Amino acid sequence: MDKLIKYFESNLGKRVLEAYKRGNKVFRELPFYTEINVSNVDESLSNDVSEEKVRLQGVIDCFFQDVDDKIVLLDYKTDYIPKGGLNEFVDKYRVQLKYYKEALEKITECDVTECYLYSFYINKEILVEI
């Protein structure tokens, strides 16, 4: 329970609550199916197939509409992060967030302006540049 309280005390958790209080939609556990270019999966493929599509499915943990209708994407993680391992942790999930961002922009027809990982292991929000 402490981890959950710490999340809602974080800046990101407060933003989620504020969005909800303003009446903006806060979405959780949104399943999605979309198609992406195969070149997004493997950049080494030849140009002959780079525009081919592959189907991608997943579940977006959370996103919300912030002020000015900006969409903020969140992905919650519980992984162990060794001391000094934060950059590796972020890099491990950067591609996943990229795919989620692309899917969410197709679904909502809005730009996703911020992407975050929230680590319950270290009780920290991490802004991820995509």
Predicted segment positions?
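Structural signature of nuclease core domains in nucleic-acid processing machines
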Residues: 1-130
